[in-house]
């Protein structure tokens, strides 16, 4: 048995939840750098400081592990968007808070953002279903406010919600990829002004 394997085996056992979190963190790093298809379970286990059998005790396959990482960060982003919308009763401030939530997510967790929006697995049905659900859940939170405030039909409000969410996501992604000289605050203000000028054109009830 190798020295590294002996070291891993002699390490104190972490509680199951802590070990799972450690594995998910290591997997995110490897999947982001290598992509799903080139990522190796050996590398993920080594980065997490566990043996490969331990990794497989938690996640029976590489796809199971990938989906668990995806679910964790989808839930995190959806929560941040919902929290932003609920943070103020003022609609202009809601738009700003929602845009800022995307930029905040990408600034604090660029690896997770790349996993969600630049995945080489987006055509995999189980991945596509989760990404669609993420978009729907974020857009639904926005559209509920639009429908309530304007009286627009739910289908119309949902389309507008998808448009707002999509714009925030794409501009935040561009800001990250281009290493923009604009500060986060400047970028958020620009995108918020664009969105608010559009959505405020719909009269309130």
What are these regions (language model features)?
Residues 1-18, 203-205:
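N-terminal intrinsically disordered/low-complexity leader segments
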Residues 11, 69-97, 140-146:
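Amphipathic alpha-helical linker/stalk segments
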Residues 19, 62, 69, 73, ...:
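Hydrophobic/aromatic residues within well-ordered alpha-helical segments
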Residues 68, 83-108, 160-164, 188:
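Hydrophobic alpha-helical connector segments
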Residues 75-78, 125-149, 158-162, 170, ...:
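Amphipathic alpha-helical packing segments from all-alpha helical-bundle domains
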Residues 97, 104-140, 151-152, 159, ...:
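Short secondary-structure transition hinges
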Residues 104-108, 112, 144, 161-182, ...:
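Amphipathic C-terminal alpha-helical segment
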């Amino acid at each position: 048995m190798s020295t590294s394997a002996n070291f891993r085996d002699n390490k104190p056992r972490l509680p199951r939840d802590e070990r799972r979190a450690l594995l998910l963190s290591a997997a995110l790093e490897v999947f982001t750098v290598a992509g799903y298809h080139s990522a190796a379970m050996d590398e993920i286990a080594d980065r997490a400081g566990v043996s490969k059998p331990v990794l497989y005790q938690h996640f029976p396959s590489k796809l199971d592990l990938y989906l668990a990482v995806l679910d964790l960060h989808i839930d995190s982003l959806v929560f941040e968007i919902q929290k932003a919308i609920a943070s103020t009763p003022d609609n202009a401030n809601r738009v700003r808070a929602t845009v800022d939530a995307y930029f905040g997510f990408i600034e604090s967790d660029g690896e997770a953002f790349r996993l969600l929006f630049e995945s080489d697995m987006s055509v995999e049905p189980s991945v596509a279903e989760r990404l669609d659900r993420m978009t729907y859940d974020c857009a639904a939170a926005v559209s509920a406010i639009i429908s309530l405030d304007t009286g627009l039909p739910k289908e119309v409000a949902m389309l507008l919600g998808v448009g707002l969410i999509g714009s925030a996501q794409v501009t935040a992604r561009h800001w990250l990829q281009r290493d923009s000289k604009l500060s986060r605050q400047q970028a958020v203000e620009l995108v918020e002004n664009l969105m608010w000028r559009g959505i405020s054109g719909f009269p309130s009830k």
